[in-house]
Amino acid sequence: FAHMFPLGTDKQYIQDMIFDVQKDIILDLARKSSCIIVGRCSDFLLQNEPNVLNIFIYAPYKARLENCVNKLEMSEEDAKRTIMKVDKARSAYHKRYAGYSPADPLHKHLMIDSSLLGVEGTADLIAEIVRQKFH
């Protein structure tokens, strides 16, 4: 009954439906033209597609905490809670739909610590790698 008339009682069913729609959109976009897809298990969804570059961008906990406090103007306690909550949710989502951790290097072509070069430097590095790989 809940599957036919979801009224908020079957949250996972709704999340599964959303994932299926996102999957169709991601595959459609990737097959039509060049694009950048952030998250949404795109490494898993596009694993059999040609001309894909799977990049995992991360930063050490301390850098993430400082970013939340300084750039997002969060208290340190709120930042800690938010980081923990977001990490847990991302990991659970990716493990549910892809079957592995989002940080699993076996499913990435490249992993970059963004604290080394900053946001702009990391973007420049990725742009150069894309130019060399696809042009």
Predicted regions and their residues:
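RNA pseudouridine synthases
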Residues: 29, 42-48
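ATP-dependent small-molecule kinase phosphotransfer cores
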Residues: 1-34
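Conserved phosphate-donor/acceptor-positioning beta-strand/loop module used by diverse small-molecule
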Residues: 48-70, 76-86
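Conserved nucleotide-binding/hydrolysis micro-motifs of P-loop NTPases
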Residues: 42-43, 59-64, 116-118
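Small-molecule kinase domains that catalyze NTP-dependent phosphoryl transfer to phosphate-bearing small molecules
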Residues: 1, 75-120
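Short, amphipathic alpha-helical "lid/cap" segments that border enzyme active or binding sites
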Residues: 23, 119-127
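Short, charged, intrinsically disordered terminal tails
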Residues: 128-135
